[in-house]
Regions:
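Disordered, acidic Ser/Thr/Pro-rich linker "stalks" and the adjacent N-terminal cap
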Residues: 240, 244, 248-339, 351-354, ...
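Short, surface-exposed beta-strand/strand-loop-strand elements in extracellular ectodomains
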Residues: 355-369, 504-518
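Short active-site loop/helix that positions an aromatic residue
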Residues: 56-68
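Intrinsically disordered, low-complexity regulatory regions enriched in Ser/Pro/Gly/Thr
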Residues: 33-37, 42-44, 49, 73-74, ...
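N-terminal BTB/POZ boundary and linker segment
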Residues: 1-58, 92-109
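Alpha-helical scaffold in the C-terminal half of BTB/POZ domains
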Residues: 2-11, 50-52, 59-60, 75-77, ...
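Extracellular carbohydrate recognition and processing domains
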Residues: 369-389, 518-538
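Hydrophobic/aromatic beta-strand segments within beta-rich folds
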Residues: 295, 330-337, 342-349, 362, ...
């Protein structure tokens, strides 16, 4: 029984149990500020004498706490002069100290800027954050440069980033504004050095020239410090991006850049690959820039209209994809973005209405002549959604070239998307090294061989709801296997699987991996160990597309059952320790036409399991009639049994 019940108290109506007189407290403290009562300190700002109360100042700010009660000389004074600050802004700050209230929208922008400086100087972090948020919301072409300077001065990174993003979207207007001429050299360099400040380089040079003439004290007498400032700003101008005509007719006559520097720029442009030039591009985080509404176009490929329309569900054997024949010298499918864009992530949906796999590579370019290969999966089997990452670069053209189709000689792409993603992804030889499970239906992994009432029960993430009849994938011992295909190659070093454990039976098994469904390498051999429930596996990092789980023993019958598979292992405290298996590494760049000498098993001739160890002799291997009946029922309802890649050759493909 609660204390209220013991005393016979009744719970009050909602809202009556709380007393909130904060507004009255604020009004009373404001009245105290305006009165002459109890004041014990006078602050002098721009010859204005401002009475205040030490204890209130100290309670609101660490700066004033140290100044007034920290044992400094000022602690003994009744008057303290605060130099180099605005009296008007300090009055606003003092009102905030006493009341916690400021009306920023009723203040002039210059006063708001001064208040931000005081909040930073006198350690009022909440006020600093609020003023910063307000300034972000009112950024315009007239005030962005002023706000950017203040944010740079106080190193307010969030506000600086907001100014940068605004400048990126309005680059041309910012360069032509009068406020641009007021930028400090440091802020100007910070603005121009960024790849995402995308405007013609000659326009940037012209704006810098205007800025220099506006800020130089005398065109004939140039001081050393201003010369250093000019040099630092000029280094932010990318002269190799300016045409020869503009260099000779505008840059050289300005006398801001020496002839040697101009010649160096010309030499760099002449001798460098186009892909090595320091291009600028638009930056639109998490926005698909390869979309027709942003001006992207398909320049090459058959049935071009489908690729960039954003439709990723309504496609079949007749429509909804773009294609090209797989043949030597084919230029593939080429997309031109609406604007040069900074990207580091491309998503591709390969046609996936059957179990076929493709191989391909992706190249990018700025001039459609000099191509840089950012992804090369020509030695790997890939299917459905492809999510590839690479170091960010400025791109205007994207080319995807199919090199292999397990069914025919045509490469089919349903959708192509290009992004800049802030997500940090670890890469090893162009392959993603994932932290999270990639053997999921959401990431387009699938089971290509095995028996189950639900094709992808092994990958649906359900590790609780399984019994004698459902929730597992299986295969007959000595015949076939359970094979999982990931959507694309990943570099992994661990796996985890859940063996069916509704009774005390034990299994033995081994696990192999492959990148092409032909060359296999063993990463775990537990064919001589009795295993139950969760199995965690660790091995040397390997490129993996296919995972083959082969059961070799079941102490209850002749069927191997697996409930769940994940890769890499997502440990959740199940009590199992990783078993490290020393494994030779399959070369990432091993050609499909040259089988690796590391092959320990071939898809057509699975290895013969070793003889049973002595510790299995106590178990009765007689099959349980119930499980035999379940397996036969699954066959009768036409479930996908051993749905291998090889069987796809007899199925229909998209019409050519």
């Amino acid at each position: 029984m609660s204390s209220q019940q013991q005393l016979g108290l009744v719970a009050p109506p909602l809202g009556l149990g709380e007393v909130d007189h904060v507004r009255s407290l604020s009004d009373n403290l404001n009245a105290l500020l305006l009165s002459d009562n109890y004041q014990d300190i006078t602050l002098i700002v721009e010859n204005h004498r401002i009475p205040a109360h030490k204890i209130i100042l100290a309670s609101r700010s660490e700066y004033f706490r140290a100044l007034l009660f920290g044992g400094l000389l000022e602690s003994q004074k009744s008057e303290i002069e605060l130099k180099g600050i605005s009296a008007a802004a300090f009055h606003v700050l003092l009102k905030y100290v006493y009341t916690g209230y400021v009306s920023l929208s009723s203040m002039k922008e210059e006063l708001v800027k001064d208040l931000l400086g005081l909040a930073h100087q006198y350690a009022f972090p909440e006020l600093e954050q609020s003023v910063s948020d307000y300034l972000k919301s009112i950024l315009s072409q007239t005030n962005m440069c002023l706000v950017y300077d203040v944010a740079n001065l106080y190193q307010l990174r969030a506000l600086m980033e907001a100014c940068r993003q605004y400048a990126d979207k309005h680059a041309t207007d910012i360069l032509q504004s009068e406020a641009f001429l007021q930028l400090s050299p440091g802020t100007l360099c910070d603005l121009l050095q960024r790849d995402s400040f995308c405007v013609a380089e000659i326009e940037i040079f012209r704006a810098v020239l205007r800025w220099w003439h506006h800020n130089s004290y005398d065109d004939c007498i140039v001081k050393e410090d201003t010369t250093n400032e000019l040099n630092s700003v000029l280094k932010s101008v990318r002269l190799p991006l300016i045409t020869l005509s503009e260099l000779l007719n505008e840059v050289r006559p300005s006398h801001l850049v020496s002839s040697d520097v101009i010649l160096d720029a010309l030499k760099f442009r002449t001798e460098s690959r186009d892909s090595d030039l320091p291009y600028r591009g638009q930056l639109m985080p998490e926005v698909n820039v390869a979309h027709s509404r942003l001006g992207a176009q398909v320049l090459q490929g058959e049935m071009r209209t489908a690729l960039l329309d954003g439709e990723t569900t309504n496609y079949d054997m007749e429509r909804g994809f773009t294609r090209h024949p797989i043949e030597d010298g084919n230029a593939g499918i080429v997309v031109r973005l609406g604007q040069p864009s900074i990207i580091n992530h491309i998503k591709v949906l390969l046609w996936d209405r059957d179990m076929r796999s493709y191989s391909y590579f992706i190249e990018v370019s700025m001039d459609q002549r000099d191509w840089v290969r950012v992804v090369d999966y020509s030695n790997y089997h890939c299917r459905s959604w492809q999510r590839v990452y690479f170091p960010q670069r400025v791109v205007r053209f994207i080319r995807i070239v199919g090199t292999h189709n397990t069914v025919n000689k045509v490469f089919h792409v349903v959708s192509l998307e290009a992004y800049y993603s802030p997500v940090v992804v670890r890469l090893e030889k162009e392959l993603i090294v994932p932290k999270h499970n990639v053997a999921t239906i959401q990431l387009s992994a699938c089971v290509v061989e095995g028996v189950s009432r639900s094709r992808n029960a092994l990958l649906n993430g359900d590790t609780k709801n399984y019994d004698w009849d459902s929730g597992y994938t299986c295969h007959q011992l000595g015949s076939g296997a359970i094979v999982v295909q990931l959507a694309q190659p990943y570099v992994v070093s661990s796996m985890r699987l859940l063996l069916w454990d509704c009774d005390d039976r034990r299994y033995s098994f081994y696990v192999e991996v492959s990148t092409n469904n032909r060359d296999w390498i063993t990463v775990c051999d537990r064919s001589r160990q009795p295993c139950q429930s969760w199995q965690s596996i660790s091995f040397a990092p390997q490129p993996v597309v296919y995972v083959r789980i082969v059961g070799t023993q079941n102490t209850a019958n002749d069927v191997f059952h697996c409930v769940h598979f994940e890769c890499p292992a997502q440990e959740d405290g199940n009590g199992f320790e990783d078993v490290v298996v020393s494994t030779p590494q399959l070369p990432v760049d091993a050609p499909l036409s040259n089988p690796s000498p590391l092959v320990v098993a071939d898809a057509a001739t699975p290895p013969v399991p070793p003889p049973l160890p002595d510790h299995f002799s106590n178990f009765n291997p007689r099959p349980l009639d119930r499980e035999r009946r379940n397996l036969e029922e699954e066959e009768e309802i036409n479930l996908p049994i051993r749905f291998t890649v090889g069987s796809l050759t007899s199925q229909r493909s998209p019409r050519q």
